[in-house]
Amino acid sequence: NMRNKLFILILFVVTLSVSAQNGSEAYTFLRFPTSTRANALGGHTVALVERDPSLIFHNPALLGAEMDGMINLNYMNYISDINVGSALFTKAHGEKGAWGVGATFISYGDIQEVLPDNVVTGASLSAKDISVNGFYSRDLSERWRGGLSLKFLYSGLADYTSIGLCVDAGLSYYNSDKGFSFGFALKN
């Protein structure tokens, strides 16, 4: 009956949210701003509709045919030895669609090796994170646009590596007459 189905659905949703609360997080570099402009605007710009391809790293629905043939390169010397960069190419797909390919990286510089008993070995370790992305967006109407991105992830610390795959989905609304935009993205 309907009551049992609802109970099972609620139990399933609660179980999913509880299992995700394990106290650790992977690929935290995905939260870093990918451009100097996004960083200056607070780090995450899911609703800003501009002809700036770097914004699609935050919301794939911000990609549009108006960005046809654009190349975007960004580099930031973040804090200390941390370097952040991105590269992106976008292309129109008909009148209502667009696609793009891009990559982001973070290099954390040299990290001094310290053993669990606080002994400094004198050796240095390197750490880096890389994301290679594919994007696609489509105008859903005159004011609404949807977008998806697929990310291949690599993370390395000394001799340890990890790879992953994740998807972003976004929606963007823009009313040019009123200068109003709204957007949201489901990330990673």
Feature annotation, model-predicted:
Residues Q21-K187:
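Subset of outer-membrane beta-barrel
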Residues N1-L6, E142:
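Positively charged n-region of N-terminal signal peptides that target proteins for export
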Residues N1-M2, S19-Q21:
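Extreme N-terminus of proteins, especially the signal/transit-peptide cleavage junction
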Residues K5-L16:
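Sec-dependent N-terminal signal peptides
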